[in-house]
Amino acid sequence: MEETAKKFMDVFSGLERAHGVYEITGQKNTAKGIKRDGRGRTLQEPLTLDLWKQHLAGKISIGVVPLKDDETCKWGCIDVDEYPINTESILATIKEMSLPLVPCMTKSGGVHLF
């Protein structure tokens, strides 16, 4: 797990003085489907290797601020919060347009496109 966490830390490097956390607080039925609710906040402390390991083990949810203090950015993410989400349509569009995106389901039921 340590080597995997180090790789994630390298690929998703970002702001070193702060990071986000997200906690699921419940879910609600909407006209468009089920949406999980949560609370996100920013902690003014570094994102450590131990926190990455906890995140990858599914114990906590973390968020990386991609923009660094030196105003560089190594990666980006599109957050799709459309409920109910049509993942087949999203995947078909990515393939049809040959977009260099990797889709990942989110804990709230949406999709992140990296």
Residue locations for each model-derived region?
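DNA replication initiation on ssDNA origins
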Residues: 1-75, 83-88
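Short, well-ordered alpha-helical packing segments
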Residues: 9, 91-95, 114
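Catalytic micro-motifs at enzyme active sites that drive phosphoryl/nucleotidyl and oxygen chemistry
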Residues: 62-68, 91-92, 98-107
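Histidine-centered divalent-metal-coordination microenvironment in nucleic-acid enzymes
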Residues: 77-78, 100-114
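A short, contiguous, amphipathic alpha-helix enriched in charged residues
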Residues: 80-96
